[in-house]
């Protein structure tokens, strides 16, 4: 999933350089949504404070 987010991020950066339009604009929107989603998941994991299992 992270690989897809990075691919969409690269496409979004290219779209920003060339101008947002068509399918590139849609991919830029998807990249923004994925970024916010992963940021929320990261913050939730930080706040939950779970420790890794001890083996």
Swiss-Prot record:
Question: Where is this protein localized, as stated in its record?
Answer: Cell membrane
Q: Which Pfam families match?
A: DUF1328
- Report the membrane topology from the UniProt record: Multi-pass membrane protein
Identify the keywords attached in UniProt to this record, alphabetized: Cell membrane, Membrane, Transmembrane, Transmembrane helix
Chain segments annotated as transmembrane: 4-24, 28-48
Q: Which named protein is this?
A: UPF0391 membrane protein Sfum_0248
> Transmembrane helix among the record's keywords?
yes
Cellular compartments per GO CC:
plasma membrane
What is the source species? Syntrophobacter fumaroxidans (strain DSM 10017 / MPOB)
């Amino acid at each position: 999933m992270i690989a897809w987010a990075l691919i969409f991020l690269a496409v979004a950066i290219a779209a920003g350089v060339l101008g947002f339009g068509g399918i590139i604009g849609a991919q830029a929107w998807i990249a923004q949504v994925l970024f916010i989603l992963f940021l929320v998941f990261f913050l939730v994991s930080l706040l939950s404070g779970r420790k890794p299992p001890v083996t």
